[in-house]
């Protein structure tokens, strides 16, 4: 393949452990804020110029189910023409 992959930025979201500040916050809400923050941090990157959104999630059930990568990318304002997918990552 001759296509180049460019990672512009990456971030790790906070944990929502029991008793923590984010314990009652849904994973998809945290990820929407995270994606919006990445877009704000990189104003030269237009949402329409993004080729893929990949989200790693430890548990693909509940609020992290139903392809969290796709749903949060849409909620964050990334065009529906941009594929979003989830990576099952037990970290």
Language model features by range: what are they?
Residues 46-52, 81-82:
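Short acidic capping loops at alpha-helix termini that bridge into adjacent secondary structure
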Residues 1, 41-43, 75-78:
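Terminal domain-initiation and capping elements
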Residues 25, 57-91:
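Conserved catalytic cysteine-centered active-site region
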Residues 1-25:
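Condensing-enzyme catalytic core mediating Claisen C-C bond formation in acyl metabolism
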Residues 27-43, 68-72:
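Short, well-ordered amphipathic alpha-helical segments that serve as non-catalytic structural scaffolds
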């Amino acid at each position: 393949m001759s296509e180049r992959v460019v990672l512009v930025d990456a971030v790790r979201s906070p944990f929502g452990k029991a008793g923590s500040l984010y314990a009652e916050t849904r994973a998809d809400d945290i990820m929407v804020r995270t994606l919006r923050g990445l877009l704000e941090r990189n104003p030269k990157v237009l949402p329409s110029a993004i080729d893929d959104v990949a989200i790693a999630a430890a548990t693909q059930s509940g609020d992290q189910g139903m392809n969290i990568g796709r749903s949060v990318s849409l909620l964050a304002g990334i065009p529906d023409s941009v594929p979003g997918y989830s990576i099952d990552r037990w970290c």
